[in-house]
Amino acid sequence: MNMPRCLLHALTALSIASTLSMTGCDSGPRTLTIGVLVAQTGPSGARGKDLLHGASLAAEEINQGGFMVDGRPLKIQIRATDDKGEVEAAALQARDLIDTGIDAMIGPVNSNQAAAVIPIVAAKGLPQLITATSATLLALGQGNVLRLLANDEQQGRAIASFAAETLHSQRIAIVVEKSDYGRGLDASVVAGLAKMHLAAIASAEIDDKSQLPLETIARFRAEKIDTLVFLAREPQLVGLLDSLEKTGWTDLAVVGTNVIRNRSVAHRPLQIRALYATATAIDAKEFPEGKVFLESFRKRYGGDPVWGAQYAYDAVYALADAARQARSLDASDLVETLKRIDPGTKVNQQMRFAATGEQVYPNIGVYKVDHEAWAMQMMSATW
């Protein structure tokens, strides 16, 4: 039976329109949705906002065009939360972000929150990129957790090496936060010192809301401590420095970690011999390509990063490059590709993930307070 010509034309037009419509869908942008789960308020709020700013800046740059995945433009969507540095809030927000349909996660900031969140994200197999440094965190995942910087076991070795070989410390005391963070670092420092035939003369533990008692400081002074390794956070450090000044004990060096290396600490007048901090988060200006990032960051936010914005910035570029090279936004493809490639990061161009998820080149720096600023003293990936 012959089909009427008008009907044939109508069906042909419909077929062409349908084909064009499908082609249009196939050539439209692909969206990579990244959850940024960080503290934006509370004690870690400044660092969390810093990470969010870095991730958002990278997303804006990528979204301005030119980034393709399997022949289609890639768009980055950032979904941010504020866990306020609270473990329960972090776990709840992780579930909420996953329910909204994210493809990857950056954060949380600190190890306590990360320990609660990692199993939740691992159950979905999503790539999770973290700045939290507790050495045990990656084992809580299922191969999906990737650390953006060195871990605390490596940092502990660096502290021991610096104290023994650079400061030539002979009488060391260690102050340890009562947490997985503090105790993990302590174990690494003690092991590192033992390899150099040294041991701490004295030690003390404090929780995250207490200060080192004056009687403990007096005991350390009586032991003629020359170097105090401080494995706790900024509020406890401020209390320690206040107490040292009140007691008139200033002839010692204090060596802390990432968590004390803040502007507020550097701006404080110091009476002690020296204040150092090891850093797994290296300042952007220390990298050859950091200048370009800093110019963009200042233009966008009106000032310099306060901590590690460049790591979240690079994390977004690493995820985007993994999507491009995998030609996929599938979680397992992203994780596998991130561990296989040299991701196209912008600031730390040595960022490379081992099969374990740790960094292949885990740079650790040592900074010293000098003229109200943290000045780099040395940096190495092998301690």
Q: What are the residue ranges of the model-derived segments?
A:
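Extracytosolic ligand-binding ectodomains
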Residues: 2-18, 22-383
